[in-house]
Structures are given as C-alpha cells and as structure tokens.
C-alpha cells in the first residue's frame, strides 16, 4: 500500500514541509525536496510497522439504486420496496447542470430506463483504530510534530488503500 502514497500530498499538505533554499540561492526542485523528506517517510513506516499501528481493512458492497432528482436512493434489495438510504448531492451551477444522481437510472419519469433498477458500488477503507489512538495520545502529550507526522501518514495510507482497492 505504501507504494501508492501520494508523496506530494503527504509531504506538502499533511506534513507541511516546503522546499528549502539551497546555498546557491535557488530552491530545491521537486526531486531534491522529496529526496530530503523520504527518510522521514521510511522512518515513520518502519515505526508504525514495528508498533503494529497500520491495520488496513476494506468493506465493499453493491446496492440496488435509482436516481431521484438530486438524490441517490439506495434500496434494501432488488424489489425496491424499502429505502435503505437516500443521499443528496449538489447539482452543478453551470451547464450542463449535472448531479451524481443523474448517472443512475431514474426512479420514474419519461426518460429511458426510468423505473428500472440500477446498482451503486461503494467501498470504505480504514487503516484501523490503533493509528488514530496513537495520534490522539501524541496530541494530548503536546508532541505536535510527532502527531502531525503520524496523523498525516495515517490519512495518506488510507487514501493509498482506497486507490489500491479501486
């Protein structure tokens, strides 16, 4: 999973590192910057592995679904007699004024496929509770740099797991 980590998102956004100014007055290029930060990533990965803090898990499912205006309706089963959930999505404010619900067969109306069942697939990922609990301990102990590194790694590893699974 670590091979899917977006280093730019981790190093710059989560960890807030920035390129440094070199002795000749120029800034590090992207590769120099990443080469400088990668040892921190390797250290964080090694310590989380040693402590058993990263426990990747995925749950997925396929659900009977229909679009209903700006809502995606999920059904308990293919009979479509009981709604499991209804999720509202924003509609674009400019042409073509699309909404995620538009990409599913409509519940009713004059459109092709109206009234027919459709399906939506979802997956949820986690790196487990242990990394979040450890990050909370670091934060409570005022170890903000350690917290930032661990929390950021947990976030980006979850993103990596989602990318891997997808």
Question: For the regions a protein language model found, what residue spans apply to each?
Answer:
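Active-site loops and adjacent core secondary-structure elements that bind or stabilize anionic groups
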Residues: 1-148, 152
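C-terminal substrate/ligand-recognition segments
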Residues: 146-166
């Amino acid at each position: 999973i670590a091979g899917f980590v977006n280093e730019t998102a981790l190093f710059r956004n989560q960890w807030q590192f920035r390129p440094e100014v070199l002795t000749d007055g120029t800034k590090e290029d992207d590769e120099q910057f990443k080469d400088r930060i990668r040892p921190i990533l390797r250290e964080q990965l090694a310590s989380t592995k040693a402590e058993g803090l990263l426990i990747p898990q995925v749950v997925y499912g396929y659900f009977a679904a229909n679009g209903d205006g700006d809502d995606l309706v999920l059904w308990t089963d293919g009979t479509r007699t009981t709604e499991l959930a209804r999720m509202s999505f924003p509609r674009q404010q400019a042409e073509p004024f699309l909404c995620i619900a538009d990409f599913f067969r409509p519940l009713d109306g004059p459109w092709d496929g109206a009234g027919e069942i459709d399906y939506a697939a979802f997956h949820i990922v986690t790196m487990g509770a242990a990394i979040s609990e450890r990050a909370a301990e670091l934060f409570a102990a005022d170890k903000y740099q350690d917290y930032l590194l661990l929390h950021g790694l947990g976030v980006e590893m979850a993103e990596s797991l989602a990318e891997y699974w997808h």
